[in-house]
Amino acid sequence: MKERTSSTVLLEKQLQTMIEQNMETFFGIRFLKSEYAITSGRMDSIGIDENNSPVIFEYKRSMSENVINQGLFYLDWLLDHKADFKLLVIEKLGMEVADQT
């Protein structure tokens, strides 16, 4: 039996795809990866800004104060895993950009 996808889940995924495909145009952010797996979970979308700093996009169907905690967790993870982020930048944008992170 196939699980039915709700329209809100579909809408969230469509929004994520649209943002990822147009991240640089909309926000000036270079897209790096979708569903970026980390120690305990995943970031919906991750990119890099004009200062070569990471930018995380999370797509939510509803408002929740938990989103702040999630953002703080991601910040803490990035601070503790700078080498992992640098490897992602090397893989997607090359060593020259990664050396500036």
Which residues are covered by each model-predicted region?
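Charged, terminal alpha-helix-loop-beta segments
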Residues: 1-101
